Amino acid sequence: ALHSKECLRLWEESGFTTHVPSAHIIAAHVHHALHEDEDAARHLAQARRIGTETEIPIGIWLSYLTEAYFHIERNDEASAIPALGRGLQIGRETGLFGTFLWLPDMLEKVAARALEDGIEAEYVRELIRRNQLAPDPTNPYPAEWPWPVKVYTLGRFELHGDDRSIEFGRKVQQKPLSLIKALVAIGGKGVSEGRFAELLWPDADGDMAHHSFTSALSRLRKLLGKDEALELKEGRLSLSNRHCWVDVWAFERFLGQAEKARKEGKEKEAIRFFEKALSLYRGPFLPFEEMTWAVPLREKLRSGFLGAVAHLGRHHEKVGRWEEAVSCYRKGLEMDDVAEELYRSLMVCHIRLGQETEALSVYRRCRKTLSSVLGMNPSAETRSIAASIGRSPA
């Protein structure tokens, strides 16, 4: 606090008013760190006033972004939105993309918040690119971030580079694609070359397997156009979380955050994270990949998805929002039409709404789907719910 006060005094005495707003912003950060919110707000107001009087927009820009950052740090994100919107508007209109006052994690956090809410999105993406910002470590996988590489594996397989789909036609060799699929399937971090040899080149000897691995890795890097996206250290391959976004990583993180909030009794927060997770799940992991190494993660993610749908559905049921529960279970069945537990829950909701015909229709669909896909009949529990409708299922 003493150093920031001395810094401000020296700039004021120097007569170089262009730097005085930045000195006030530094002082505001010091007071914020000391939980002296009124003093922090006073310095931000001074920075804004001087910036306006001297017609130096960078001081105004930083004061608004700093105000938004303080609100985000206090978990008062709703209050951050007005300041964030005004600051980013000023930055866009005046062409501000850099600052000599570099404040750790501030730009990262306000940029992530802005992208999530769709505030000045194009300007924010350019701000991120020019400053080579990495996502906030507490929220490391925002899909809206302009990642150099994005990997989509849920319900599809797509690679994106700089927000554009990477096209790979019939001429593209499959081993580089298999390499990144397998890398994601077995964790994406620190996977040994030997493990890839076992999965992708099981019949090759040591030298041939090594040559195949290095060749596939080289082709994959060329396809992605970002060498740094794939890190090879001491024979272990990783996807860089500074350069790559993977839908599976984001999905699992949201599920983890939801479970943590649920265990802490923060139901509203848990629901928000479950909804974020479900928005990412477009279907099974690598649905057209037949290799056995894809199965464990596929089943794990499916279980997480069904658990999230069930939790959201029960939440709606608990507060009597039966129509919302119906919508939730239907969306779940769109992604996984052999999830018998979702059919049961959907039947119960229709019964509670007095929609017996719809409940019976759901049962018939369940019976037909389970028979044709899995070669099995509905469980006794499911048949019991159908029988409770008052009519024998046809």
Regions flagged by a language model, labelled:
Residues 1, 19-35, 62-74, 104-113, ...:
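Tandem amphipathic alpha-helical repeat scaffolds
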Residues 1, 11-26, 38, 51-66, ...:
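Alpha-solenoid helical repeat architecture
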Residues 182:
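Segments forming glycine/polar-rich beta-alpha architectures that bind adenosine-containing cofactors
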Residues 199:
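Residues within the alpha-helical elements of helix-turn-helix
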Residues 17, 79, 93-119, 168-177, ...:
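Intrinsically disordered, charged and Pro/Gly-enriched terminal/linker segments
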Residues 3-7, 23, 40-47, 63, ...:
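Tetratricopeptide repeat
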Residues 42, 115-177, 227-238, 283:
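Short boundary/linker motifs that mark transitions into or out of structured domains
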Residues 214-221:
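Short, hydrophobic-biased segments on the C-terminal half of alpha helices
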